[in-house]
């Protein structure tokens, strides 16, 4: 079965692409408000995602759209201090999560997949995440993977429940991120109890062995740091070290480092670049004067990473857009500024991680289908026949879900309509003699 997704807070489509690559999902609607990101998204997917998910117009459009899974890489925002007792419509009002929750409450998708920064776990002393979990589990009727109830009926989870690092999914980037996956109890009923309590912790494919496999062998001189800026960074790091702080630049492929790995690349660019400096001496660079830099280029062979290298770290280049002929088709629209390229990659997701999550979600769907159809067959064996109402009561599922399961069992020729009835079904004697 192919599941339909909607891609909200879409950026340049990293989450969508990861789900598509699993082979089980196709996207039917998107929403993004950043003009430059929209241009890249349109360039990559042939679809203009320029929609504002906070508007009533868009929410009505979603309500009219047949889809199964809501995807969103939403921003981390503080909620009202009014308290959870008021419900998400009061507690989260004015945030993007409020609008996501509103859309979920109106449309009840089969599953929800949310991505956010690692800081979401501890944001506002944990209150932000607590509100999100409480909203999904308590108000919207979803089972969140990695969340359980303690003896007092409080939601229980740890960092390990949600945080996964890109470096464990085939790319050399130390990028811990929050991933929240939830399944509708209204649709799947007690089927959600059959699901595992843990998201995938590692991928099964190495995309780039280490940072050396990501780096371009030769880059344009413009990526080399000016002597003045390089000296400023060294002085800043010395001050930080003197004050007992570990902040400052980092040369991630310095001599002696085995299996080098990049630090997190960021949409803001600055610290993401300075914490990912590259040692790569190049003849003729030292002392060279460029019009774009105030001082000559440094003599130590230090440069920043290129947008192409950032694209590889996120799995966009060298992985996510390779066609059936093995050709890498990723590109930005002509004229996209270098600063925008850094921003869009830094603000996106790591596609190999998302693909692994998508495959895990598919496995969850398959497991619930298998378990629930098995229970239906067991009941038919015990009672001779079964109705839609029996399935609803047995599995605690919606009528739509009961009809879906029954349809699959009939198409598989496991069940047939009982003779002389219109609503009762029995085992197919040819399949179950």
Named regions from a protein language model:
Residues 47-53:
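Conserved SAM-binding strand-loop segment of SAM-dependent methyltransferases
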Residues 410-420:
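A short, conserved structural fragment
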Residues 41:
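Conserved SAM-binding loop
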Residues 60-67, 77, 81-272, 284-287:
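Class I S-adenosyl-L-methionine
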């Amino acid at each position: 079965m192919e599941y339909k997704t909607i891609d909200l807070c879409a950026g340049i489509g990293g989450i969508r692409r990861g789900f598509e690559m699993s082979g089980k999902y196709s996207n039917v609607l998107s929403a993004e408000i950043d003009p430059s990101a929209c241009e890249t998204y349109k360039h990559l997917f042939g679809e203009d995602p320029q929609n504002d998910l906070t508007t009533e117009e868009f929410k009505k459009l979603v309500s009219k759209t047949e889809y199964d899974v809501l995807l969103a890489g939403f921003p981390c925002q503080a909620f009202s201090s009014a308290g959870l007792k008021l419900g998400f419509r009061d507690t989260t009002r004015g945030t993007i999560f409020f609008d996501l929750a509103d859309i979920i409450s109106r449309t009840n998708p089969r599953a929800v997949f949310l991505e956010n920064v690692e800081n979401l776990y501890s944001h506002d002393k944990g209150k932000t995440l607590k509100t999100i979990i409480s909203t999904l589990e308590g108000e919207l009727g979803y089972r969140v993977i990695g969340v359980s109830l303690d003896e007092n009926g409080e939601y229980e989870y740890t960092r390990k429940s949600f945080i996964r690092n890109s470096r464990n999914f085939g790319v050399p980037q130390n990028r811990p991120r929050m991933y929240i996956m939830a399944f509708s109890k209204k649709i799947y009923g007690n089927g959600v109890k059959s699901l595992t309590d843990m998201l995938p912790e590692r991928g099964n494919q190495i995309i780039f062995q280490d940072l050396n496999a990501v780096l371009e062998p030769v880059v344009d001189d413009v990526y080399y740091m000016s002597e003045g800026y390089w000296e400023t960074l060294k002085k800043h790091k010395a001050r930080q070290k003197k004050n007992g702080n570990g902040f400052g630049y980092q040369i991630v492929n310095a001599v002696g480092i085995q299996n080098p790995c990049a630090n997190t690349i960021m949409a803001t660019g600055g610290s993401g670049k300075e914490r990912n400096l590259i040692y790569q001496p190049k003849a003729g660079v030292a002392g060279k004067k460029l019009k774009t830099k105030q001082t000559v280029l440094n003599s130590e062979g230090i440069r920043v990473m290129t947008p192409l290298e950032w694209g590889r770290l996120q799995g966009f280049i060298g992985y996510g857009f390779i066609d059936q002929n093995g050709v890498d088709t990723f590109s930005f629209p002509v004229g996209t500024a270098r600063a925008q390229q850094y921003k869009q990659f830094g603000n996106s997701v790591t596609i190999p991680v998302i693909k692994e999550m998508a495959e895990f979600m598919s496995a969850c769907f398959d497991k619930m289908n298998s378990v629930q159809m098995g229970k239906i067959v067991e009941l038919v064996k015990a009672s001779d026949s079964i109705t839609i109402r029996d399935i609803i009561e047995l599995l605690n599922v919606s009528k739509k879900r009961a009809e879906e399961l029954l349809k699959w069992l009939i198409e598989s020729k496991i069940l047939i309509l009982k003779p002389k009835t219109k609503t009762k079904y029995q085992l197919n004697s040819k399949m179950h003699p």
